[in-house]
């Protein structure tokens, strides 16, 4: 609070960026409770103090382009979703080179996460002419490159990073909850 940043930059995979989204809300509204933050599409207006930039280093959650954040309470084993277009980052930096150092287990897990998001966007009851092309292209890209990416093909790893972002743009606008 004393520092007063006008930009918050989150770098990492889904969990660090999701945590930074929650911290951004707390920075803008110090008195907001976690329960209030969890009210679906009930966030207060953000960007009064700071804008938000997300730099993704993994290829799965696409949180850098979505209106969602998942905060996990590991002690209770509960995942709390935050959902509001207010927490969509202002700037997303999707540099495929950042994903090239992911361990293969993470490549597999995040790749399946991206595929799930793309399929979910396509079959969503809120899909539309804008979300379907993004979802279908992401599905095609993931189908063609996930195994190659897992096997160390860096061009495929780059493609996966872009595909997960397309899937994120699709599901953030077609909404979630089916798959």
Language-model features: locations:
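Gly/Ser/Thr-rich helix-start
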Residues: 13-15, 61-63, 112, 169, ...
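Short, intrinsically disordered, charge-balanced linker/junction segments flanking boundaries
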Residues: 1-2, 169-179
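Carboxylate- and glycine-rich phosphate/diphosphate-binding segment that chelates Mg2+/Mn2+
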Residues: 68-174
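Glycine/threonine-rich beta-strand-loop-alpha-helix active-site module
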Residues: 2-97
